[in-house]
């Protein structure tokens, strides 16, 4: 079993927080821990998809094409909605319990919630292009997210 977290880092202007929506689908590339096989296709993983393996509920059950090993991933319950993040510093966006696989790549895509410095929430934000901007008329401020980078870490 390997627990991993995904963090983002970006240049932020007038942004207080970024976190995945409840229905966020995480697009990942995974590597089999047994044979090292990395499929070419992105795998979509979301909390609402629950599969039963033995006595466990998992969000993804997959079989490695290289060695036929059964593997699984569970998205851990976390709440990032009440924090404040800083520009150009890593901030965690998800944790995973991986059995038989390791996360190799992450593609942010869509379904993010962005909170401005004034507290206004923007829903269904798409970060696929690596940047996002909006003008908040109420406060006459420009909101920007630039140079998004992701990192994957093993955690205890």
UniProtKB/Swiss-Prot annotation:
**Record Pfam families:** CXXC_Zn-b_euk
Alphabetically sorted, this entry's keywords are: Metal-binding, Zinc
UniProt: Zn(2+) binding residues:
32, 35, 64, 67
Extract one GO molecular function annotation from the record.
zinc ion binding
Q: Where is the signal peptide?
A: none
Q: Which InterPro entries match?
A: CXXC_Zn-binding_euk (IPR008584)
Source taxon at top rank? Eukaryota
* Segments crossing the lipid bilayer: none
| Keyword Metal-binding (UniProt) | yes
Tell what the record comments on domains.
Requires a bound zinc ion for normal folding and solubility.
Q: Write out the similarity annotation.
A: Belongs to the UPF0587 family.
What is the name attached to this protein's record? UPF0587 protein
């Amino acid at each position: 079993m390997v627990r991993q977290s995904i963090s983002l880092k970006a240049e932020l202007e007038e942004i207080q927080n970024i976190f995945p929506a409840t229905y966020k689908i995480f697009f990942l590339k995974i590597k089999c821990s047994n044979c090292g096989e990395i499929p070419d296709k992105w795998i979509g993983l979301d909390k609402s998809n629950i599969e039963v393996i033995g006595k466990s509920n998992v969000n993804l059950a997959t079989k490695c094409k290289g060695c036929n090993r059964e593997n699984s991933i569970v998205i851990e319950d976390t709440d990032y909605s009440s924090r404040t993040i800083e520009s150009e510093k890593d901030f965690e966006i998800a944790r995973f319990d991986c059995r038989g696989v390791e996360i190799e790549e992450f593609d942010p895509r869509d379904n993010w919630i962005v909170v401005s410095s004034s507290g206004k929430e923007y829903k269904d934000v798409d970060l696929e292009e690596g940047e996002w901007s909006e003008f908040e008329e109420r406060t006459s401020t420009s909101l920007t997210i630039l140079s998004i980078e992701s990192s994957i870490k093993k955690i205890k």
